[in-house]
Design a protein with these regions (language model features):
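An alpha-helical support segment within catalytic cores of ATP-dependent transferases
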Residues: 13-24, 151-152, 169-211, 221-224, ...
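Conserved N-terminal phosphate-binding loop of PLP-dependent enzymes in the Aspartate aminotransferase
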Residues: 529-961
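A cross-family kinase active-site recognition segment
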Residues: 94, 124-182, 204-206, 290, ...
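ATP/Mg2+ or Mg2+-diphosphate-binding catalytic cores
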Residues: 4, 8, 175-176, 298-351, ...
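A conserved alpha-helical element in kinase catalytic cores
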Residues: 58-107, 125, 130-134
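Zn2+-dependent peptidoglycan hydrolase active-site motif and core
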Residues: 419-420, 434-465
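Active-site activation/catalytic loop segments of kinase-like enzymes and analogous catalytic loops
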Residues: 244-278, 292-310
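Acidic, glycine-rich catalytic/binding loops that coordinate metals and/or anionic ligands
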Residues: 349-380, 469-472, 482-541
Length: 961
């Protein structure tokens, strides 16, 4: 069969400005500034006319008139329907024709005028979030569905950009590629893709498709700072083709936005497409070969066009971009891609052929060979030393052990990953044997045994390697090399071109192209390990949602499964490491050895309820009161902050006889009935206004950034509202006033100078008591102040604390005066089952010890200033940063859409948090409008982690979210 593209050369039209101006004026009555728009083989010009913007399309004479008629008909077909996306419309010329003809330099061209769609091409954005990728797939599928009943003779044509003809395009134009090695590789890989497609072609559905839903043809509107695809332009590639090819074209165009992970780009586009127009298993099987085909034919086409138009900037950029995309696609193992894409839409991943049965053990095993746990949750990993070699060594017997395939593992530094092979540990010098027959070669430091047409055995960690063309089972390949942890790594790889690292992200799909070498490793047969599915975290989330109340929220839409913490880092089940910027519960850091030791010791001795008499309860209470000013000398021990604030409310009622409480607007104090009543945060208590009991009296939020009062007298002016309520209630009718000394729920907003002093004076003058809620902001987190109330230079009547008091072990406290405390006795005794338990108090004392010994309050000053300075510098470049609140390591980055109106950037904040999680930083929004990034990491955070946070925030704000 002849190649329809052999010898076909299609240079773009190049009409000069004067001619274009005449066409617009004479035929369409349009005039104004012109701007050339890029195109591979047509000429497109935008005119900014007084009546609006329009696109003049000068079509290449190499394309059929019938095809142009089909394009116009398709645009009108869609424009006349209630489709969920925007499309351009063709406009008639002075003669009433939708297609006109002009002649330039002896060549006749078809010309059309179409409406211009407002927005920005998707191509102009760097980073594209998974939600945007899925939306792009949704748009492509929505267009295909809307065209499904469209028919026109012009749909049936042979087109260079039809992915069905990619092989012919590569054959016709590969000669334009000057890089001989690159050309040969491209031709070879294209042939492999075509071979796979030939076997599937009969199962691939054909339908009318736009076939060019690419980033240059998709127009977006801004939605919460994200590009949101909502329009499609340029119907130049419209034809009847494979539906699966439509997906491939849509996906390949976006790979340039994420060259380091092309597979996830295609998976997300597929997910969006499949939700509208479901693909079959055969179509999903064909998708990666189609991706390869599109990438290869794009390179060949661009290189050929460059020969025709060597000075065209659009073509030059296309060549560079197409090569980058090709190289990214080229690195993805095909089996991995098929497996990931199948699982993305709920199809079973294809099964690999079974590896050959081992005919010889890999080594001569001793009698006892333990299985070694190197998982994220391995008990042998010391959180202090983080010596992963020692964690393995402690499990070995006489230096022997066997590792696990498909296991999520930690790394000594940075991210871990999932193991693509397994290893055995053995004394140095142990001979390593070929388990099966095969050909052997050395590749770098590895020995590679080619077993059959599917499998390669890759062995690392050997010395004295013996390489021969063929080996029989039992042939010595080398010996275990000397090293800190001697052993050999075995990987069974079903891919001839790539060998994966030992640890990879699960999303890479490498577990679909490798197998467990268990049978070839173990001293006795054991079943191959089946790794957890790639969507394991999502499955666990489904189980969580099925068994837990919906009100019990979780971070993130698709949260990682976190199973380990160390210091200021969190680790998911696959070994991915995250900088933890939100965990003020573990104030010392995760897995603190002193807290672990104290809790373990106490658990071995005693843990019981607080009615028993034991030393830890007294010792912790004495230490706590020593940290507080007089006359705060009497302690109630509880378990949580909500419980602490509930006790504080009871103390107020018992001591004053009044139930009336003043609380600050938009604050949060807990989830119990009483504390919920005094919490008016919109996010935490959206029904506060309608459900507020009569004894709760809300005063103006003393927020000098968002509130009505600013300047040096703001504290007094906000306190006027406290005085107003006190006056309305009257002396003797005021129970108390509760406030966080630093406005934690608003993101660490510092109260105006003098506010608490004035508010406390007004309340006390009326016979009321003042509660400082230090649950979030106290305990040294502010750096310069151990307690938040110190920053306001006041002493409360009651202080509540919890959350960080036991570094994650439930323990909280209410501290007041002896006189106030004794008033509660008149109502009966006080008891909290686990409040002040021996274990809780042991953890709390260990926490106080470490705060002092490790200088963590001073670290909060230093690192907090570093973060604030870095964010303030970013604010000079990014107006979305309205201000930086707080002190020490209780900070809030308030995001706004307008620095004058302070319109909250709520959706942007959530998108930024999602993007930062992808980049390895855990941060969350807070505040009434959920537009403040809360920065309250463990106080052990160091400069490197703070800089990582700043770097990730910089990238996110620069490249998008």
């Amino acid at each position: 069969m002849s190649n329809p593209f052999a010898g076909l050369q299609i240079p773009s039209p190049d009409l000069d400005v004067e001619h274009v101006t005449r066409i617009l004026s004479d035929r369409y009555g349009k005039a104004g500034p012109l701007r050339a728009l890029g195109s591979h083989q047509d000429q497109n010009v935008m005119v900014d006319d007084a009546s609006g913007r329009f696109i003049l399309k000068i079509s290449n004479p190499g394309f059929s008139h019938e095809g142009l008629l089909a394009q116009n008909a398709a645009m009108l077909h869609l424009a006349q329907r209630d489709v969920p996306f925007r499309v351009p419309r063709p406009l008639p010329d002075a003669d009433g024709e939708l297609i006109g003809k002009v002649t330039d330099a002896g060549t006749t061209y078809d010309v059309r005028l179409v409406t211009f769609l407002d927005g920005t091409p998707l191509a102009e954005f760097d980073y594209l979030a998974p939600t945007v990728l899925r939306r792009h797939g949704w748009l492509a599928a929505s267009v295909a569905v809307a065209l499904s009943d469209f028919d026109h003779p012009g749909l049936d044509r042979t087109l260079q950009w039809d992915v069905r003809h990619a092989s012919d395009v590569v054959k016709a134009y590969a000669g334009a590629i000057s890089d001989e090695a690159g050309r040969d590789d491209l031709v070879l890989v294209m042939a492999r893709a075509q071979s796979l497609l030939d076997g599937l072609a009969d199962q691939l559905r054909i339908a009318p498709c736009h076939a060019d839903v690419t980033d240059v043809n998709v127009v977006v509107q801004a939605r919460a700072g994200q590009p949101w695809p909502d329009a499609i332009i340029d119907f130049g590639d419209l034809l009847r083709t494979w539906i699966a090819g439509d997906v491939a074209v849509a996906g390949v165009s976006l790979i340039a936005h994420s060259l380091d992970d092309p597979l996830s780009v295609i998976a997300n586009v597929l997910r969006g497409y499949h939700g509208v127009l479901p693909l079959t298993e055969s179509e999903v099987a064909a998708l990666w070969p189609l991706v390869v085909s599109r990438a290869a034919s794009s390179v060949a086409s661009s290189e050929n066009q460059l020969l025709l138009e060597p000075d065209d900037e659009y073509v030059i950029r296309s060549v560079e971009d197409d090569w980058r995309v090709w190289r990214a696609v080229r690195e993805v193992p095909w089996r991995s891609a098929h497996g990931v894409l199948a699982e993305t839409v709920g199809f079973p991943a294809p099964k690999l052929p079974l590896p050959p049965v081992a005919q010889s053990p890999a080594v001569k095993w001793p009698a006892v060979v333990p299985s070694v746990d190197q998982s994220v949750t391995a008990d042998t990993v010391d959180p202090t030393s983080w010596n992963l070699h020692e964690a393995v060594r402690s499990q070995l017997v006489d230096g022997w052990g066997v590792g696990q395939y498909g296991e999520g593992r930690l790394s000594a530094v940075g991210d871990g990953g999932v193991s693509t092979g397994a290893e055995f540990f053995a004394p140095a010098g142990t001979p390593v044997l070929a388990p099966v027959a095969g050909s052997v070669e050395q590749q770098g430091d590895d020995v590679v045994v080619t077993v059959d047409d599917t499998w390669r055995l890759v062995i690392g960690g050997l010395s004295d390697v013996i390489v021969g063309s063929e080996v029989a089972p039992g042939t010595q390949l080398g010996v275990v090399a000397e090293g800190e942890l001697p052993g050999a790594r075995l990987q069974l790889v079903a891919d001839y071109e790539h060998t994966p690292p030992m640890l990879v992200p699960r999303s890479s799909g490498w577990l679909h192209a490798t197998a467990d070498p268990a049978e070839w490793l173990a001293p006795e047969p054991r079943p191959a390990r089946v790794p957890e599915p790639s969507d394991e975290a999502a499955r666990l989330l489904q189980r969580r949602n099925a068994v837990l109340a919906r009100a019990q929220e979780h971070y993130y839409e698709e949260p990682p499964r976190i199973e380990r913490g160390r210091g200021h880092f969190l680790f998911d089940v696959d070994g991915r490491r995250y900088v933890d910027m939100v965990n003020n519960v573990t104030i010392l850091g995760h897995s603190h050895p002193a807290v672990e030791a104290a809790v373990s010791r106490q658990l071995r001795l005693l843990n019981t309820n607080s009615r028993f008499h034991y030393g830890a309860m007294v010792e912790f209470s004495e230490r706590l009161t020593a940290l507080l000013p007089d006359p705060l000398d009497t302690v109630f021990l509880v378990s949580t902050g909500s419980e602490a604030n509930e006790v504080a409310l009871r103390l107020v009622r018992a001591a004053t006889g009044s139930h009336n409480m003043l609380a600050v607007r938009s604050a949060y104090h807990g989830w119990t009935t009483g504390t919920d009543a005094i919490s008016t945060s919109i996010a935490d208590n959206p029904g506060a206004a309608s459900s507020r009991p009569s004894w709760v009296h809300i005063v103006e939020s003393p927020n000098p950034y968002r509130g009505p009062f600013k300047g040096p007298d703001a504290g007094e002016r906000y306190a006027d509202d406290v005085r107003r309520v006190v006056t309305e209630l009257g002396a003797g009718n005021v129970g108390g006033f509760i406030a966080e000394p630093v406005y934690g729920n608003a993101g660490g907003v510092l109260l105006p100078d003098g506010y608490l002093r004035a508010a406390y004076d007004a309340v006390r003058d009326a016979g009321g008591l003042c509660i400082a809620d230090e649950v979030q902001v106290g305990y040294g987190r502010l750096g310069d102040y151990f307690w938040g109330f110190d920053q306001q230079d006041v002493v409360p009547d009651i202080v509540t604390m919890a959350k960080c008091t036991g570094n994650g072990i439930p323990v909280g406290a209410v501290v007041t005066t002896r006189d106030i405390a004794d008033r509660l006795l008149e109502e009966g005794s006080f008891f909290s089952s686990m409040g002040g338990s021996p274990v809780g108090c042991a953890a709390a004392m260990a926490t106080l010890d470490a705060l002092e010994a490790e200088g963590l309050q001073q670290n909060a000053v230093r690192i907090g200033a570093r973060i604030a300075d870095g964010v303030n510098a970013l604010a000079e470049q990014h107006p979305i940063i309205g201000t930086v609140h707080g002190l020490g390591l209780y900070r809030g980055i308030e995001l706004v859409r307008d620095r004058e109106t302070l319109e909250p950037a709520s959706e942007e904040a959530m998108g930024i948090c999602e993007r930062m999680r992808e980049l390895g930083v855990i941060v969350q929004p807070t505040g009434d409008y959920m537009n403040v990034l809360k920065i309250k990491p463990p106080l052990c955070i160091d400069e490197a982690a703070a800089d990582t946070f700043l770097d990730v925030l910089t990238v996110t704000l620069r490249d998008g979210w």
